[in-house]
Amino acid sequence: VTKKFTIFVGIQILFLPATTQIFMNSLGAIYLDSAIRRLLTYKTLGDKTFAQLEEQDFHYTPNDESNSISVIIRHLHGNMLSRWTNFLTEDGEKTDRNRDAEFTPPPLGKEALIALWEEGWSCLLATLRSLKEYDLLKTVTIRHEPLIVIDAINRQLAHYPHHVGQIVYIGKMIRNEKWQSLSIPKGASAEINQKMKELHTKDPQ
């Protein structure tokens, strides 16, 4: 008699022979894909903000205690290169990183700042795309603190949108009534909800 075991997939319960080879995405692969997709949405928010800004806007600071978009980009660039270069084999806080200098950088133009933005994101995404499911339970260190890989990823999943949100908010302050919304515009919730319902409840052809 062929033994059977149960696999839970979402809300479905599959009863499969123990000898059956199961070809489906593992939880680890699903997690990595989800992390990459979420990070790409954060990058897109930044990209769409930059597209609305002039050169001088990157250096605007709301007050003395706030950072400009230029400074935030420099900080994210330094963080991403430090955290994701040789991610599995070296401490995430590299000895050649000067974090304090990221907050008092020499001025750069819009094109140079966006180049740093792209370099940081490219390093991050290339590393995540190279990871395999079995890497997720390995241990890495950040400032000598041991973390399993999945926790190290989650740490940055919280850190980066924090700063992207700052970029978007400063962009909205600068553009004011000329700001082009990056999410659901005010007063458009019902319309968007209806469109999403139609999109996701279409009858299969």
Residue ranges and their predicted role:
Residues 23-36, 104-105, 112:
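Short, charged, low-complexity loops and linkers
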Residues 105-140, 148-162, 166, 204-205:
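Acidic/histidine-rich alpha-helical segments that form the ligand environment
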Residues 23, 36-40, 44-47, 57-100, ...:
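Short, contiguous alpha-helical
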Residues 3-4, 13, 22:
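Polybasic, lysine-rich low-complexity intrinsically disordered segments
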Residues 39, 43, 50, 117, ...:
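Hydrophobic alpha-helical core bundles mediating ligand binding, dimerization, or RNAP-core interactions
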Residues 52-60, 127-137, 172-177:
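Surface-exposed helix-capping loop/turn segments at secondary-structure junctions
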